[in-house]
Amino acid sequence: MSELTGGIIECILKIIVVLLIFSALAGFGTYLERKVLGFFQRRIGPNYVGPYGLLQVVADGIKLFAKEDIIPQNAIKPIFILAPSIAAITAFIAMAPIPFFPEFEIFGYVVRPIIADINVGILFVLAVSSCGIYAPLLAGLSSGNKWSLIGGARAAIQFLSFEVITILSLLAPLMIIESLSLIDINNYQQGSMLDWLIFKQPLAFGLFIIAAYVELNRTPFDLLEHEAELTAGFATEYSGLKWGMFFIGEYANMFATAFILSLVFCGGFNDWGFIPGGIAILLKVCFFIFLFMWVRATFPHVRPDQLMRMCWKIMLPLALLNVLITGCILLF
């Protein structure tokens, strides 16, 4: 077998593994979130289907597959069908340059847990993730429903505004590292905990994690589908597998964002004291996933005007100031 053929087979196997694992994690994420929310609200959460309610995910999946797939009469059919696919596809493509774990060896063969090691990895993630805006936007425009249309309009405003904050918040750490490769970013922090960028760029971390909440459409920033105002927003007319693809895309993005936060700001998969690197990054990712769910249980919704005011009048000046200060420190 030639080296090229072996590389192609290895890449295909990695893609299949990532698709299977993160699709399963998306389903398990719903169970975990319901358990966490139940804990904060002094409830038990899912506990009837299987031991500790673990088979609730399977029951939900069966229900989802069994639901009738309905397309509204006034919908623009091709775009209506395309929108959920964009949500899921962009979420998984964005994972290509993410190094999930350190290298390990199986039967003498060195495995690198990354699909594509490109030197502009973080730029690729941002570019592909930003294409995900087309999913709620097209869904809202094509559904023929006023609530969906308002949800799609909010998606365009919300995502485009916070793309600016996301990029500017990452600009300062990238100026320090002088590389766009996620592996280089990870290797930069391989010393002690004081080398983690969360301590060198705390403002950038705060801005990035808030922007991540907004772009993931998580509470308290889920203005695209706020139940009290828009029923289900852009997804009002979706059911069955099409709705499921939106949900898979959202949770896959959430896990990918947790990996990005761990890699860029929290030391990545470097050894953490006596804890091996692979276990260390899993602990960090689990912490950020729990944090996403904790915030949902804690904070009330914000209004769209409050969100835009926070973006343009507070976060944008802070992000620009952080870039300016970092540039001056590096220059002088």
Swiss-Prot record:
- Which reaction(s) are listed as its catalytic activity? a quinone + NADH + 5 H(+)(in) = a quinol + NAD(+) + 4 H(+)(out)
Q: Which GO terms describe its biological process?
A: aerobic respiration
| Keyword terms, alphabetized | Cell inner membrane, Cell membrane, Membrane, NAD, Quinone, Translocase, Transmembrane, Transmembrane helix, Ubiquinone
- Has UniProt tagged this entry with the keyword Lipid biosynthesis? no
Q: What is its EC number?
A: 7.1.1.-
Q: Name one Pfam family in it.
A: NADHdh
Q: Name one GO cellular component term.
A: plasma membrane
Provide the membrane topology annotation. Multi-pass membrane protein
The cellular location(s) given in this protein's UniProt record come to: Cell inner membrane
Q: What is its main location?
A: membrane
Q: Which InterPro entries match?
A: NADH_UbQ_OxRdtase_su1/FPO, NADH_UbQ_OxRdtase_su1_CS
Which terms does the record give in the GO molecular function aspect? NADH dehydrogenase activity; oxidoreductase activity, acting on NAD(P)H, quinone or similar compound as acceptor; quinone binding
Report TM segments. 8-28, 44-66, 78-98, 120-140, 157-177, 196-216, 245-265, 274-294, 312-332
Which top EC class is given? translocase
PANTHER family (alphabetical): NADH DEHYDROGENASE SUBUNIT 1, NADH-UBIQUINONE OXIDOREDUCTASE CHAIN 1
Q: What does this protein do?
A: NDH-1 shuttles electrons from NADH, via FMN and iron-sulfur (Fe-S) centers, to quinones in the respiratory chain. The immediate electron acceptor for the enzyme in this species is believed to be ubiquinone. Couples the redox reaction to proton translocation (for every two electrons transferred, four hydrogen ions are translocated across the cytoplasmic membrane), and thus conserves the redox energy in a proton gradient. This subunit may bind ubiquinone.
Q: What is this protein called?
A: NADH-quinone oxidoreductase subunit H
Task: State the organism of origin.
Answer: Helicobacter hepaticus (strain ATCC 51449 / 3B1)
Protein encoded by which gene: nuoH
